[in-house]
Amino acid sequence: FLTNEERDVSQEIKAVEISSAELSRLVAELVFEEILSGQTKVRHRETKADYDFNRFLDGAPYRQASHDLTLEVLTPVGSDYELMSDAKCIGRSAEGPGRAIIKLANEGRVDLELRTYLQIEKYIGPKNDLATPALKRILMDRKDENRQRRGRLLIQLATMMTNGKVYALGQQPSIKAQAPSTLADDLLNYLVANTYSKLGYIKVRAADPLAEIRAVLTADSVAQSKIAEATTEEGNALALAEMRQYLALAASQNRVLLSDVVDRFAKAPWGWRPAWETVLLVARLFMAGEIKLVMESNDLDGPGAVEPLTKEARFRNVSILKRKTNDNATRQKAREIHRDLFAQMPPDEQDALVATFRENLGARKAALADLFKALGGGWQDAYKPETKVVAATSAK
């Protein structure tokens, strides 16, 4: 039995206007913040890397974002829900680089419960401060009633999710789960695996990529010569070739920032995460002598590159430039000239070859200077005409 005041409150609540935008905001909050626990990243099971994703509800973004991956939830509250057939959902899931859709099952007139919940919340807010004791009791009862209604709505929406249909990348994958969180995780993992078609180029991931970067940058000369020649899975040959091809074009004329390289390969179709996987490839090409690393107008050497390549905040300070390297035939000819001059075969690696040439030429120059000095003057005097005459006369 309701009192007159309770009946009046009920009528006033029913008269409260609720817009479609308010309904959508509530559903988005219930689905994304409570049922899916505010999740904004998915951990790829195979690579253990994290991927951010956008959240959409009925075609509108929730908490604006601009990532490669998008998870959209279609609900009966949406104006186009009835029009979204399997064919249209499949087509919509093919939009953008990586999109997945969960279309909720249409069960139990959830829209009426959502509207009633919002009407009560909207009615109670401005009434509390000025309410009489009797009205305050009525409002508290309605607040308790709404708390229970919210719990029922969460259960109902969760059931509608697991009973719904899923679509991704223009397909309708066979993904079913008992819980909404598991459903979303399975669907997003499917999205990662099929959006990033070159994710598998990195076959082997370092257990400690930072330690691996340091090891590469401080490798000895023998190890350096083998760093970029890896053709096995352990050397991630496909990923290394992909990086080499990109830098051969992008960094041949202009310098490219390391931060831009990392951002590029984190996106589709590569999806290389974390950033250290990309930096490790750059470090290998650098130590193999294929690229130069420049910071503050100074060329970096291996040990000098350790600090900026192991701190993400420094990536914007490091520029990459493709080095001009000689082919095998040219290097072999230079090695043979060195052998003829100095009776020893120098290293094949370009930097080591140049360094050996300079060292031995410097030693030869010093030896000749000592020889001319021993003959009675500086080496410059040996070429003066009078020096040659004196030497010839003395010989007679």
Model-based region annotation:
Residues 1-375, 380-396:
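Extended alpha-helical interface modules used as scaffolds for assembling large macromolecular complexes
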